[in-house]
Amino acid sequence: MRCLPVFVVLLLLIASAPSVDAQPKTKDDVPLAPLHDNIQNTLQTLRKKVCCRPMQDCCSGK
């Protein structure tokens, strides 16, 4: 029964604590959108290199 007040106080402290990112951003952080664009460009380049005949669908840029 002695632990209950301590538990309640801890819950109140946790609930009132400001939400802060656990890991602050650094200058090396990269947004995911450009990374996704780079992956798409790389995949398109690889598709073009794999295609060896001009009549195949992958060569038409689709």
Curated annotation (Swiss-Prot):
<dbReference type="Pfam" id="PF16981">
    <property type="entry name" value="Chi-conotoxin"/>
</dbReference>
<keyword id="KW-0732">Signal</keyword>
<feature type="modified residue" description="Serine amide">
    <location>
        <position position="60"/>
    </location>
</feature>
<keyword id="KW-0558">Oxidation</keyword>
<feature type="modified residue" description="Methionine sulfoxide; partial">
    <location>
        <position position="55"/>
    </location>
</feature>
<keyword id="KW-0027">Amidation</keyword>
<feature type="propeptide">
    <location>
        <begin position="23"/>
        <end position="47"/>
    </location>
</feature>
<keyword id="KW-1015">Disulfide bond</keyword>
<dbReference type="GO" id="GO:0005576">
    <property type="term" value="C:extracellular region"/>
</dbReference>
<keyword id="KW-0800">Toxin</keyword>
<protein>
    <recommendedName>
        <fullName>Conotoxin TeAr151</fullName>
    </recommendedName>
</protein>
<dbReference type="GO" id="GO:0090729">
    <property type="term" value="F:toxin activity"/>
</dbReference>
<dbReference type="InterPro" id="IPR031565">
    <property type="entry name" value="T-conotoxin"/>
</dbReference>
<keyword id="KW-0165">Cleavage on pair of basic residues</keyword>
<keyword id="KW-0964">Secreted</keyword>
<feature type="signal peptide">
    <location>
        <begin position="1"/>
        <end position="22"/>
    </location>
</feature>
<comment type="similarity">
    <text>Belongs to the conotoxin T superfamily.</text>
</comment>
